[in-house]
């Protein structure tokens, strides 16, 4: 007859099997990740909230109090401003990276020219030569600020690209670079320098002009030119046909039909003006 195991041994072994089974169950269970906290300040969350408000406000059967609707409209405007600021920040970073090298090299070149001209001004004795050197020194100093404070959000226009293409002699390099035509922004930087550092920084960080503002500035010029052309045509027609009579529409004709020949004549005149030789 075999010996029986003590009660303590059987109990301890049973607990061991139970713990192992629990471990297997724990490891086999699928892991449920905790839901990530929603960042309400993130750009994606702001865009999602703005789209939700727009969809709500564009409903035909919208029935919410007027004060609640006003709050939603103000919230939507604030979200759109934040989205636009984020887009402008991204575009600004892209433009800075794109034109970083050319701005850096032109700034270094302008600083080198300014240093050379300062030495020449200190050594020169002829008044005419001193005046010319000072003028060149002023151009070099403006070139430095141009390379630094050119608006970040606008395509950079190089100062020395045309001069470098026509460079022949090393001796006249500074003269060749400093006496070439400058882009329009150079004059803006030159005038802004008089208002101080803060004005230059505002110019550097200004936002690009929109197409509507450009059209508004160009529209008066186009209207003036069109008015002059119309008056000139009218004067030529009056001089060529002083006694011409105006044709009246027949009774059976409509008002629009009587004006057709005149419209065709004006269209032919305008087309002839824009034709190339």
Curated annotation (Swiss-Prot):
<keyword id="KW-0698">rRNA processing</keyword>
<feature type="region of interest" description="Disordered">
    <location>
        <begin position="1"/>
        <end position="38"/>
    </location>
</feature>
<feature type="compositionally biased region" description="Basic residues">
    <location>
        <begin position="22"/>
        <end position="34"/>
    </location>
</feature>
<feature type="compositionally biased region" description="Polar residues">
    <location>
        <begin position="206"/>
        <end position="221"/>
    </location>
</feature>
<dbReference type="Pfam" id="PF10153">
    <property type="entry name" value="Efg1"/>
</dbReference>
<dbReference type="InterPro" id="IPR019310">
    <property type="entry name" value="Efg1"/>
</dbReference>
<feature type="region of interest" description="Disordered">
    <location>
        <begin position="204"/>
        <end position="277"/>
    </location>
</feature>
<dbReference type="GO" id="GO:0000462">
    <property type="term" value="P:maturation of SSU-rRNA from tricistronic rRNA transcript (SSU-rRNA, 5.8S rRNA, LSU-rRNA)"/>
</dbReference>
<keyword id="KW-0539">Nucleus</keyword>
<feature type="compositionally biased region" description="Basic and acidic residues">
    <location>
        <begin position="1"/>
        <end position="12"/>
    </location>
</feature>
<dbReference type="InterPro" id="IPR050786">
    <property type="entry name" value="EFG1_rRNA-proc"/>
</dbReference>
<dbReference type="GO" id="GO:0005730">
    <property type="term" value="C:nucleolus"/>
</dbReference>
<protein>
    <recommendedName>
        <fullName>rRNA-processing protein EFG1</fullName>
    </recommendedName>
</protein>
<comment type="similarity">
    <text>Belongs to the EFG1 family.</text>
</comment>
<feature type="compositionally biased region" description="Acidic residues">
    <location>
        <begin position="266"/>
        <end position="277"/>
    </location>
</feature>
<dbReference type="GO" id="GO:0030688">
    <property type="term" value="C:preribosome, small subunit precursor"/>
</dbReference>
<keyword id="KW-0175">Coiled coil</keyword>
<comment type="function">
    <text>Involved in rRNA processing.</text>
</comment>
<feature type="coiled-coil region">
    <location>
        <begin position="66"/>
        <end position="126"/>
    </location>
</feature>
């Amino acid at each position: 007859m075999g010996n029986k195991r003590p009660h303590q041994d059987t109990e301890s072994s049973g607990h061991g099997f139970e713990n192992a089974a629990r471990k297997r169950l724990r490891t086999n269970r699928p892991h449920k990740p905790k839901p990530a906290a929603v960042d309400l300040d993130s750009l994606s969350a702001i865009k999602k909230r703005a789209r939700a408000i727009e969809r709500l406000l564009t409903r035909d059967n919208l029935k919410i109090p007027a004060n609640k609707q006003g709050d939603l409209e103000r919230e939507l405007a604030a979200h759109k401003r934040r989205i636009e600021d984020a887009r402008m920040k991204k575009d600004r970073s892209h433009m800075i990276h794109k034109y970083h090298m050319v701005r850096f090299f032109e700034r270094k070149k302008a600083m080198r020219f300014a240093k050379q001209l300062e030495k020449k001004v200190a050594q020169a004795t002829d008044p005419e030569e001193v005046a010319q050197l000072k003028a060149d020194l002023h151009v070099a100093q403006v070139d430095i600020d141009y390379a630094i404070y050119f608006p970040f959000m606008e395509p950079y226009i190089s100062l020395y690209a045309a001069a470098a293409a026509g460079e022949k002699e090393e001796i006249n390099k500074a003269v060749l670079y400093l006496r070439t035509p400058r882009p329009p922004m150079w004059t803006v930087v030159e005038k802004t320098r008089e208002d101080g550092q803060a004005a230059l920084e505002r110019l550097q960080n200004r936002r690009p002009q929109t197409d509507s503002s450009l059209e508004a500035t160009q529209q008066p010029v186009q209207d003036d030119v069109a008015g002059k052309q119309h008056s000139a045509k009218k004067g030529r027609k009056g001089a060529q046909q002083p006694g011409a009579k105006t044709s009246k529409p027949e009774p059976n004709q409509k008002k629009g039909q009587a004006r057709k020949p005149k419209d065709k004549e004006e269209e032919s005149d305008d087309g002839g003006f824009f034709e190339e030789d």
